[in-house]
From Swiss-Prot:
NCBIfam families: Hol_resolv_Hjc. The gene is hjc. GO terms for biological process: DNA recombination; DNA repair. A second Holliday junction resolving enzyme, Hje, probably with different substrate specificity, exists in this organism. Disruption phenotype: Not essential, it can be disrupted. No change in sensitivity to mitomycin C. Double hjc-hje mutants cannot be made, double hjc-pina mutants grow more slowly at 55 degrees Celsius (versus 65 or 75 degrees) and do not grow to the same cell density as wild-type. It is an enzyme of class 3 (hydrolase). This is Crossover junction endodeoxyribonuclease Hjc. Gene3D superfamilies: 3.40.1350.10. Its cofactor is Mg(2+). The record marks K56 as: Transition state stabilizer.
Length: 143
């Protein structure tokens, strides 16, 4: 299975899991396409809370890099949409989510997450609870 196919499979799996948790979600893959604008791989919304997820997968290894141009593009998308940007990182069988501001910026302007930072990220259920904790509850919702 090619890396592109593995990435697409992972993105579809995430979309399905988010949908099962009540999110409105779309997959917007752009890698390998001729798109000039950069968009995150997954856009998910729940009760007005928007999360944007750039997915990266590694069989093993200790770092995940995002090139400067791609990072700046998806950060701009996040700013325009009002969404919160995350890196979804799958290393071996673990799937973790990091807020994009947790990534370190290199001297060349690229972004990197080392293995320790990735391991400290949220798992899927923690990500869902994080989003649900941001949903505003009004008095009407309790009646």
């Amino acid at each position: 299975m090619s890396n592109k196919t593995k990435g697409s499979t992972l993105e579809r799996y995430l979309v399905s899991r988010l949908r099962d948790k009540g999110f409105a979600v779309i997959r917007a893959p752009a890698s390998g396409s001729n798109r000039k604008d950069h968009v995150p791989d997954v856009i998910a919304m729940k009760s007005g809370v928007i999360i944007l997820i750039e997915m990266k997968s590694r069989k093993n290894g200790n770092k995940i890099y995002i090139q400067k141009e791609q990072a700046e593009g998806i950060k701009e998308f996040a700013k325009k949409s009002g969404g919160e940007l995350f890196l979804g990182a799958k290393i071996a069988k673990d799937l973790k989510f990091l807020r994009f501001d947790e990534l370190r910026r290199t001297e060349a302007g690229n972004y990197v997450a080392d293995l320790e930072t990735i391991k400290s990220g949220m798992d899927f259920d923690e990500l869902v609870r994080y989003v649900e904790g941001k949903i505003s509850k009004t008095l009407d919702s309790f009646m």
